[in-house]
């Protein structure tokens, strides 16, 4: 099994426990303690990102999206992201989180990291609208391709596509044009 060199940012202890059950006790995580993410934790994440890199791996719910966005907005440079879909969560669980996902879904997410760079601008809003990428049917296809949650807003998808440096031609290939 591949050893993960970066620090993984998760929401809580159960997420850390789940990841360590898969990757071993040498795996390093930082827990945001849910939405109580504070400046000190953000500074620590920034320091680790500059030294060894971090992977943001938050739950596929509203709080997880907000935590991910807060961290990305705080960091100045590239950051790795892992995504898990709600469909990958144990159906009998009342919670929607990393701790409730299957081992295979977690491995797949961490094997398919996506790099975000806030400084990328590969797509204009006009191009995004004129090519109908904002339409729900196209957003679903794009989100599925990148393993994003299907319920992200059009503006968030636009921003994330730019941060990943995805071109118009790339998106057209994804949606089958």
Curated annotation (Swiss-Prot):
InterPro entries per the UniProt record, alphabetical: RNase_M5 (IPR004466), RNase_M5_C (IPR025156), TOPRIM_dom (IPR006171), TOPRIM_RNase_M5-like (IPR034141)
Main location: cytoplasm
Molecular function terms from GO: metal ion binding; ribonuclease M5 activity; rRNA binding
Record's cofactor remark: Binds two Mg(2+) per subunit.
Gene Ontology CC annotation, any one: cytoplasm
Cofactor(s) needed for function: Mg(2+)
The keyword Metal-binding belongs to this UniProt entry's keyword annotation: yes
Subcellular location as annotated: Cytoplasm
Residues annotated as binding Mg(2+) 1: 11, 59
Record's keyword annotation contains Magnesium: yes
Enzyme class: hydrolase
SUPFAM superfamilies: Toprim domain
Biological processes per GO annotation: rRNA processing
Domain spans labelled Toprim: 5-99
Entry keyword set: Cytoplasm, Endonuclease, Hydrolase, Magnesium, Metal-binding, Nuclease, Ribosome biogenesis, RNA-binding, rRNA processing, rRNA-binding
Protein purpose: Required for correct processing of both the 5' and 3' ends of 5S rRNA precursor. Cleaves both sides of a double-stranded region yielding mature 5S rRNA in one step.
HAMAP family referenced in this protein's UniProt entry, alphabetically: RNase_M5
Protein name according to UniProt: Ribonuclease M5
UniProt source species: Mycoplasma mycoides subsp. mycoides SC (strain CCUG 32753 / NCTC 10114 / PG1)
